[in-house]
Amino acid sequence: MEKKQISKIDNYYNKLLKIHGVKPHALGCPKGRQSIRFKNIDNLIFKNCKILDFGCGFADLLNYLIKNHASYKFKYTGCDVVSNFIKISRNKHRGSKFIDLNSDSINEKYDIVTAFGVFNLKYTKSNEDHFKIVKKELSKLYNISKKYLLIDFQSPFVDYKQKDSYHQHLDPLIKFIVKNLSRRFEIIHSYLPYEFSILIRKDSQITKNNQFKL
């Protein structure tokens, strides 16, 4: 992602942070929506797994995991390009690792990589250019995941679209995933009417009896 796009993201969310404070609306997310989308990770968690929360915001996913999956003793890392989000998250969760992507980089792999709400703000003037960024970032995230990549998008099947919002069409996204990432994926379009998630599984090898490994 280029500096001008990172600057747009930083400016956009800092304005919301100034207006709303440390609340879901500062992330461009209505109250109550996060916990619903986070449920998509429930069946992926396993003992001692390493999780990367890409675009972590206020580390609300970590709050959810602690509340619902503490017994798995997972290792959480959050990262974001909005430095103020990282500062807030570090103060809230002093025992967890947070990466400010403006000054640090991701140097390891994770069992589960999530990206919630990351691609909802349109970074460019055209949808085509934004989708190029989506594909580039998905490739990076897929490469640092060991087992699962879980991402969400705003659905194209809506009654209206806000000015700077990005709604991902399914057909080009699926074609990209199948061709460049994995043939093992799930589309989850049943938990909210205006967004969907895609779970991409890293292991797409076929065994001798022509079945996917589990």
Ranges and model annotations:
Residues M1-V22:
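N-terminal, positively charged/glycine-rich alpha-helical extensions of SAM-dependent methyltransferases
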Residues G32-N48, Y64:
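Conserved alpha-helix/loop element of class I SAM-dependent methyltransferases that forms part
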Residues S145-Q154:
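Conserved beta-strand signature within the Rossmann-like core of class I S-adenosyl-L-methionine
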Residues K161-L214:
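Class I S-adenosyl-L-methionine
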Residues L52, F58-I99:
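Class I SAM-dependent methyltransferase SAM/SAH-binding core
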Residues I133-K140, I144:
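Short, conserved SAM-binding segment of the class I
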Residues I112-F131:
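A short SAM/SAH-binding and catalytic strip from SAM-dependent methyltransferases
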Residues S105-V113:
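A short acidic, Gly/Pro-enriched loop at the edge of an enzyme's catalytic core
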